[in-house]
Amino acid sequence: NEIKELADEELIEIEKILTDLSLLAAQSVEDILYDMETLVALDFIFARAKFARSYMGSQPIFNTEGMIDIKAGRHPLLEKHTVVPVDIRLGEDYNLLIVTGPNTGGKTVSLKTLGLFTLMGQAGLHIPAMEGSRLTVVDDVFADIGDEQSIEQSLSTFSSHMSNIVYIMNHATPNTLCLFDELGGGTDPTEGAA
C-alpha cells in the first residue's frame, strides 16, 4: 500500500514538473519557433550540400531566354555508375526536341532527367551534371509520361493521355516546360505503337 502511495506521489510530482516546464516553454514560444525554423533551414542547407556532394552535382546557370544546356546529366534516382550521361540542348536554335530511338534506349529517362533537373534547379538544388550546365526559369512543368504499357488498357491509356494533353495545352504558357512521352502511343493495340 505504501509503494502505491509513493508511486502516486511520484506521478503528481512528474505532472507538476511537466506543467512548470510547459509554462516556461510557453513564455519562450516565439524564440523556440525561431530556433526551430533556423534549424530547419540549416538542415535543408546541409541536406542539399550532402546531396550535391554524393551526386557530384553542380550549380546550374539560370537564364530567362529559354535556353537549356545540360552537359553529361545523370538521372539522380538511377545508379550513378551505370547511367549513361545525357546531353540536352534546347532554346538557342530550336525550342522543340523530338527524341527517337529503340526501346530501352533512354528516351523516357532523358525526359524525366530534364523535368527533374528543372524542378531541382529551381528549388535551389545542384544537379548531377557537369559545371556550366544551363537551365531556364519556367513557370510550370507539365509531363505526360506513360510508364504503363498494358495492351489490355490501351483505350483507357489513350484516353488518359489525350485528357492530359488537352489539360497541358490549355494551361501551358510560353514559359512552360512540356514533356510528352510516346505522344499518340497506344492508338491501336495491335500495332503497339510507341
Feature roles, as predicted:
Residues Y55-M56, N63-A194:
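ATPase nucleotide-binding head domains, primarily ABC-like/P-loop NTPase cores
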Residues A7-E10, I14, D43-F46, A72, ...:
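A structural signal for well-ordered alpha-helices, especially hydrophobic packing surfaces
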